[in-house]
Amino acid sequence: MNWEKFVEEKVKEIRETVGDSKAIIALSGGVDSSTAAVLAYKAIGDKLHAVFVNTGFLRKGEPEFVVKTFRDEFGMNLHYVDAQDRFFSALKGVTDPEEKRKIIGRVFIEVFEEVAREIGAEYLIQGTIAPDWIESQGKIKSHHNVGGLPERLNLKLIEPLRDLYKDEVRELAKFLGLPEKIYNRMPFPGPGLAVRVIGEVTPEKIRIVREANAIVEEEVERAGLRPWQAFAVLLGVKTVGVQGDIRAYKETIAVRIVESLDGMTANAMNVPWEVLQRIAFRITSEIPEVGRVLYDITNKPPATIEFE
């Protein structure tokens, strides 16, 4: 891919589309939205307003990382919206994964529209990439930035990366000068940790899975492994264990570590046994609510990478 030509075309396209209007971009700190943000910033400068929504479903340290990177280092107009209570309320009692994704998508858009009205933006730029809409079109699962969009969108949508795959987005990010800590980040689902909790989402469950997720990422990095994705899932199943001489009844965490080129297919990684043992030991030691850790060895297909 000739990235110079690609950037030139996209910058021209975004600049002509937005004109004298303003645009907002859905920024998560992941490689897709970060790349789309830098591309759009190149095109329209201060007419771009980056919107970062703290859903309550983010990775450990994510909000601080995003604010520091984009507001302090890139100098972008960054609007930080703390919408945690709003998302948890909207998901109360909801257990169906597809419904969860759609609700999260709807609340996302509501938040964006409110900010857009405040700043007078007409355009919403999103970091949607090819696998997102292919999976949504194929009815595999809704992606919050496509399937969750309401029929009547009050903002005009611009998706500059929609024909690219993840490996291409990483190349583009590198070309645009994004730091390695962003372009080499593991993919993270738009709905965040909400789809790594099976069943109803509560602040307590998110706290558990956030800690477990951080442990998995830390140990994978420490072992020098370079998977496509590595994460933890709270299964919502309690099992019997032993604590001292007493019977315990605690939560179960599944660990998923996969290799892939573009996310369309994936293989469970053959992780060294001592790494898995260290992950299991740390999760059960550091998170008192968890008593059992499982390793998922299923490929994609038949499974998807995320559990929901």
Curated annotation (Swiss-Prot):
Name of this protein: GMP synthase [glutamine-hydrolyzing] subunit B
Pfam families in UniProt: GMP_synt_C (PF00958), NAD_synthase (PF02540)
Keyword Repressor set for record: no
InterPro entries in UniProt: GMP_synth_C, GMP_synthase_B, GMPS_ATP_PPase_dom, NAD/GMP_synthase, Rossmann-like_a/b/a_fold
Subunit structure: Heterodimer composed of a glutamine amidotransferase subunit (A) and a GMP-binding subunit (B).
Biological or metabolic pathway of the protein: Purine metabolism; GMP biosynthesis; GMP from XMP (L-Gln route): step 1/1
Annotated catalysed reactions: XMP + L-glutamine + ATP + H2O = GMP + L-glutamate + AMP + diphosphate + 2 H(+)
HAMAP family referenced in this protein's UniProt entry, alphabetically: GMP_synthase_B
Gene3D superfamilies the UniProt entry points to: 3.30.300.10, HUPs
Superkingdom in the source lineage: Archaea
UniProt KW keywords: ATP-binding, GMP biosynthesis, Ligase, Nucleotide-binding, Purine biosynthesis
Protein function: Catalyzes the synthesis of GMP from XMP.
Chain residues that bind ATP: 28-34
GO cellular component, one term: cytosol
Known EC number: 6.3.5.2
Top EC category: ligase
Name of the gene this protein is made from: guaAB
This protein's record includes keyword Membrane: no
Molecular-function annotations in GO: ATP binding; GMP synthase activity
UniProt domain GMPS ATP-PPase: residue ranges: 1-185
